[in-house]
Amino acid sequence: MPEWIDRVPYNSGTVDLYAPETAGVYRLIYKSNDDYYVFYVGQSDNLKERLKDHLSPGEPNECIKNHLKNHDCFFRYIEIGTQSERDRIEREEIDHWKPSCNTV
């Protein structure tokens, strides 16, 4: 099983440097005081493109936009090639972290 990458500061420069153009599941994380909280879990067939989409002014999820504006944010990802495996891992991550910006 692939491993989650370590937390990376979330901005367009680090996405360009660290996010691959491959499929996977990702977490968006914010830091408050000395604690870290997952605020969104998603998946994509192109992690770099999707992570950049969230940083764009056109991001439709207001919750994500507010976290990015008001907190120091980070991302982590795991590369997963098959859609069924991405679906499973995304659901497990959402069930585990209960991120505030995911809607059901």
Predicted regions span which residues?
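GIY-YIG nuclease catalytic motif and its immediate N-terminal context
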Residues: M1-D53, I80-I94
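A broadly used, surface-exposed interaction patch
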Residues: E49-H71
